[in-house]
Amino acid sequence: MSVDLATVKRVAKLARIALPEDEAERVMGELNGILGFVEQLSEVNVDGVEPMTSVMPMAMRKRKDAVTDGGKADDIVANAPETDRHFFLVPKVVE
């Protein structure tokens, strides 16, 4: 697969990137190089290879889910001019 100049210009327009004509030629070459590398990767035989998310085998530490108020209610309303039981009080706007 390769991209032509029209495709490069269309992608630049969709991405809202100003792309001068001389830059479009260079970008076309770079994109074709990237696509060539991706095609090489698709030729690699990965039969029997386990999918992985990291090169280092790691297990996430899990904690028990617990619902809390975060312990920050006093800090959150500390600078509010008026509060009532950790709720902000604001002037009535709609009649």
Curated annotation (Swiss-Prot):
InterPro entries: Asp/Glu-ADT_sf_sub_c, GatC
Domain of life per record: Bacteria
Protein role: Allows the formation of correctly charged Asn-tRNA(Asn) or Gln-tRNA(Gln) through the transamidation of misacylated Asp-tRNA(Asn) or Glu-tRNA(Gln) in organisms which lack either or both of asparaginyl-tRNA or glutaminyl-tRNA synthetases. The reaction takes place in the presence of glutamine and ATP through an activated phospho-Asp-tRNA(Asn) or phospho-Glu-tRNA(Gln).
EC number: 6.3.5.-
One GO molecular-function entry: ATP binding
Family classification: Belongs to the GatC family.
Catalysed reactions listed for this entry: L-glutamyl-tRNA(Gln) + L-glutamine + ATP + H2O = L-glutaminyl-tRNA(Gln) + L-glutamate + ADP + phosphate + H(+); L-aspartyl-tRNA(Asn) + L-glutamine + ATP + H2O = L-asparaginyl-tRNA(Asn) + L-glutamate + ADP + phosphate + 2 H(+)
The organism of origin for this protein: Allorhizobium ampelinum (strain ATCC BAA-846 / DSM 112012 / S4)
One Pfam family this sequence matches: GatC
Record HAMAP family: GatC
Protein name as it appears in the record: Aspartyl/glutamyl-tRNA(Asn/Gln) amidotransferase subunit C
Subunit architecture: Heterotrimer of A, B and C subunits.
Keywords: ATP-binding, Ligase, Nucleotide-binding, Protein biosynthesis
Main EC class the enzyme belongs to: ligase
GO biological process per UniProt: glutaminyl-tRNAGln biosynthesis via transamidation; regulation of translational fidelity; translation
